[in-house]
């Protein structure tokens, strides 16, 4: 989907994420970012791979979420780099990936709830259909660039 490997975000989003990282670090975790800013061309490619509006924003509806540079897909890892147990793997396009958590192990649900609590405290809102997806509550203008 991407022609680059680095994660790009708005400066204000990065500042909020740094506060969240400090909170997680105090609990023994680091943030692992899977996805961040997404150029519009990449959004179009992703839609071709998964044309399901529950999981991928339809590019015909304009620039949304990842295209604005204020949304991240993330998880937590321990200090030695092991991913913390969460409800599903990344980009699991099933109902188990939503924020209901009634159909996943309690440890995974507790970890996801803890991550959501910290991210909310730091100015993010989670997408209901994906436990890993967080958007900055600050609204940003659309931007489209190829890193």
Model-derived features: positions:
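Cell-envelope/glycan interface and biosynthesis
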Residues: 1-147
């Amino acid at each position: 989907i991407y022609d680059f490997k680095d994660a790009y975000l708005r400066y204000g989003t990065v500042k909020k994420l740094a506060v969240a990282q400090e909170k997680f670090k105090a609990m023994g975790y680091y943030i692992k970012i899977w996805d961040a800013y997404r150029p519009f061309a990449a959004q179009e490619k992703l839609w071709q791979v998964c044309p399901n509006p529950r999981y991928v924003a339809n590019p015909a509806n304009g620039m949304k979420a990842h295209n604005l540079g204020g949304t991240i897909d993330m998880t937590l890892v321990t200090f030695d780099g092991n991913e913390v147990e969460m409800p599903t793997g990344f980009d699991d396009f099933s109902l188990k990936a939503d924020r209901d958590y009634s159909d996943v192990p309690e440890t995974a649900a507790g970890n996801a709830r803890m991550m959501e609590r910290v991210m909310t405290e730091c100015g993010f809102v989670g997408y209901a259909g994906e436990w890993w997806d967080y958007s900055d509550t600050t609204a940003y203008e659309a931007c489209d660039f190829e890193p």
